[in-house]
Structures are given as structure tokens and as C-alpha cells.
């Protein structure tokens, strides 16, 4: 604040020295009229009041290992390039039914941040017909307590668990999918010929845009989350006799 004050004073003094005064306006040798200084003081007071009342940039502060919720402009969520079907901001937990998780969850108190053509996502691999099974078993849940994550540069960042939007606290949820077990059956992946193949199930990742903070600067960043369970195969070495 003091820096702004000194800057305004300096700018004015430079302007006073550079202003071409006429004889009829300010006679040579006379000081600047008191009314002029009064006008200057009024201008400075107005500038300082505006500086004090101007909203500061949102900075997240860490308290006991957690991050305080920060105020976010709701217009920020209208940028389509930031949309992800796996990220949700809500004042209440998303539905967690055993059959499906509705990604178009639009109950009161939810930011329509994740609109997508995929209206529903299964929380577990479904069995469509009798006798059909998944090679790997997975489970999908909304994660609302994520505090840290790895960004696309491989750097660990702090995830903003909560943000303040229009004086309401919204929690940031991530829809994550991971493997139930690395070996659904004793030999590895289900349905794989273990005589010729080694196999195991593993969780894969993708990057989504999320609100994070790093070195007290809040910003959108790509972070890595679990998104699928796949089977990894490797051919067994054959002995040549």
C-alpha cells in the first residue's frame, strides 16, 4: 500500500514540474496554490480507498497440512476447455449407488462442470449376459478427500479439496477407477491361457483439469488420477529342445 502511495506522489511531482504554467496562472516564484494540493490529497485518498477495497488475487494458505477454501469466480467454470467428466464440484456427496454413478448429477448445490454425452458410468464392470466376465475386476468411486496429486510435469501439487463459490462451499470430487486385485484368479487375469501367457491386472491413469495450489498459487492444472483397470500380458519363454 505504501508503495502505491509513494508512486502516486512521485507521478504528481513529475507532472507539476512538467506542466507549462502561464503568467496568468502561476506567477514566477510563487508556490503551488493550496487548492491544488487539496485536490491532490483528494485524488490520493480516492486511489487508496479503491486499492484497499479491490479484491485481492485468490491465494491459498496452508493450515495444519490442509488448504483453506478460496473464493472462485463461477464464470471460470464456463470454460469448456477445463471440463472433465471425472471432476465434479458439489456441496453434497454424489450418488454412490451400486449400479451406476450418474455423471450428470445436477442436484441443488452442484456446479454443472462435468456435462458429457456419457450420462452414466458403471461403478463395477457389469455382466451383460450370463457367462460373460471381465478379464479384470475394477471398482469406481467418487473421491472427495484428495489432498495431493502428481501433475503432468511429474511434480507433486496440493489439491484444493474445497472452494467458495457464491458464498457456498463446494467440495471437489474425482471419479476414479482402479483394480480390485492384481490377480482375479490364481494364474493372473481371468480367461487368459496361463500355459502360454503371464498376466496381471493393473490400474492405469489419465490427466484431468483440477483446481490445485502450488507454492500458495491457486490454478487449474492437469493432475493424474486412476481411470481404468487393464490386463497386462507377456508371452512365456518356451524351451527349445
Swiss-Prot record:
<dbReference type="GO" id="GO:0005615">
    <property type="term" value="C:extracellular space"/>
</dbReference>
<feature type="glycosylation site" description="N-linked (GlcNAc...) asparagine">
    <location>
        <position position="114"/>
    </location>
</feature>
<dbReference type="GO" id="GO:0031904">
    <property type="term" value="C:endosome lumen"/>
</dbReference>
<dbReference type="GO" id="GO:0045664">
    <property type="term" value="P:regulation of neuron differentiation"/>
</dbReference>
<comment type="subunit">
    <text>Homodimer. The homodimer interacts with a single NTRK1 chain. The homodimer interacts with a single NGFR chain. The NGF dimer interacts with a single SORCS2 chain (via extracellular domain). The NGF precursor (proNGF) binds to a receptor complex formed by SORT1 and NGFR, which leads to NGF endocytosis. Both mature NGF and the immature NGF precursor (proNGF) interact with SORCS2 and with the heterodimer formed by SORCS2 and NGFR (via extracellular domains). The NGF precursor (proNGF) has much higher affinity for SORCS2 than mature NGF.</text>
</comment>
<feature type="binding site">
    <location>
        <position position="209"/>
    </location>
    <ligand>
        <name>a 1-acyl-sn-glycero-3-phospho-L-serine</name>
    </ligand>
</feature>
<dbReference type="InterPro" id="IPR020437">
    <property type="entry name" value="Nerve_growth_factor_bsu_mml"/>
</dbReference>
<dbReference type="GO" id="GO:0048675">
    <property type="term" value="P:axon extension"/>
</dbReference>
<dbReference type="GO" id="GO:0046928">
    <property type="term" value="P:regulation of neurotransmitter secretion"/>
</dbReference>
<dbReference type="GO" id="GO:0051279">
    <property type="term" value="P:regulation of release of sequestered calcium ion into cytosol"/>
</dbReference>
<dbReference type="GO" id="GO:0051388">
    <property type="term" value="P:positive regulation of neurotrophin TRK receptor signaling pathway"/>
</dbReference>
<feature type="glycosylation site" description="N-linked (GlcNAc...) asparagine">
    <location>
        <position position="69"/>
    </location>
</feature>
<dbReference type="InterPro" id="IPR002072">
    <property type="entry name" value="Nerve_growth_factor-rel"/>
</dbReference>
<feature type="binding site">
    <location>
        <position position="209"/>
    </location>
    <ligand>
        <name>a 1-acyl-sn-glycero-3-phospho-(1D-myo-inositol)</name>
    </ligand>
</feature>
<dbReference type="GO" id="GO:0048812">
    <property type="term" value="P:neuron projection morphogenesis"/>
</dbReference>
<keyword id="KW-0483">Metalloprotease inhibitor</keyword>
<comment type="similarity">
    <text>Belongs to the NGF-beta family.</text>
</comment>
<dbReference type="InterPro" id="IPR019846">
    <property type="entry name" value="Nerve_growth_factor_CS"/>
</dbReference>
<dbReference type="GO" id="GO:0010976">
    <property type="term" value="P:positive regulation of neuron projection development"/>
</dbReference>
<dbReference type="GO" id="GO:0008289">
    <property type="term" value="F:lipid binding"/>
</dbReference>
<keyword id="KW-0967">Endosome</keyword>
<dbReference type="GO" id="GO:0031398">
    <property type="term" value="P:positive regulation of protein ubiquitination"/>
</dbReference>
<keyword id="KW-0339">Growth factor</keyword>
<dbReference type="GO" id="GO:0005163">
    <property type="term" value="F:nerve growth factor receptor binding"/>
</dbReference>
<comment type="function">
    <text>Nerve growth factor is important for the development and maintenance of the sympathetic and sensory nervous systems. Extracellular ligand for the NTRK1 and NGFR receptors, activates cellular signaling cascades to regulate neuronal proliferation, differentiation and survival. The immature NGF precursor (proNGF) functions as a ligand for the heterodimeric receptor formed by SORCS2 and NGFR, and activates cellular signaling cascades that lead to inactivation of RAC1 and/or RAC2, reorganization of the actin cytoskeleton and neuronal growth cone collapse.</text>
</comment>
<feature type="binding site" description="in other chain">
    <location>
        <position position="171"/>
    </location>
    <ligand>
        <name>a 1-acyl-sn-glycero-3-phospho-L-serine</name>
    </ligand>
</feature>
<dbReference type="GO" id="GO:0005788">
    <property type="term" value="C:endoplasmic reticulum lumen"/>
</dbReference>
<keyword id="KW-0446">Lipid-binding</keyword>
<dbReference type="GO" id="GO:0007422">
    <property type="term" value="P:peripheral nervous system development"/>
</dbReference>
<dbReference type="GO" id="GO:0008083">
    <property type="term" value="F:growth factor activity"/>
</dbReference>
<feature type="disulfide bond">
    <location>
        <begin position="179"/>
        <end position="229"/>
    </location>
</feature>
<dbReference type="GO" id="GO:0097192">
    <property type="term" value="P:extrinsic apoptotic signaling pathway in absence of ligand"/>
</dbReference>
<dbReference type="GO" id="GO:0010628">
    <property type="term" value="P:positive regulation of gene expression"/>
</dbReference>
<feature type="binding site" description="in other chain">
    <location>
        <position position="171"/>
    </location>
    <ligand>
        <name>a 1-acyl-sn-glycero-3-phospho-(1D-myo-inositol)</name>
    </ligand>
</feature>
<dbReference type="GO" id="GO:0043524">
    <property type="term" value="P:negative regulation of neuron apoptotic process"/>
</dbReference>
<keyword id="KW-0646">Protease inhibitor</keyword>
<dbReference type="GO" id="GO:0038180">
    <property type="term" value="P:nerve growth factor signaling pathway"/>
</dbReference>
<dbReference type="GO" id="GO:0007623">
    <property type="term" value="P:circadian rhythm"/>
</dbReference>
<dbReference type="GO" id="GO:0070374">
    <property type="term" value="P:positive regulation of ERK1 and ERK2 cascade"/>
</dbReference>
<dbReference type="GO" id="GO:0045773">
    <property type="term" value="P:positive regulation of axon extension"/>
</dbReference>
<feature type="propeptide">
    <location>
        <begin position="19"/>
        <end position="121"/>
    </location>
</feature>
<dbReference type="GO" id="GO:0008625">
    <property type="term" value="P:extrinsic apoptotic signaling pathway via death domain receptors"/>
</dbReference>
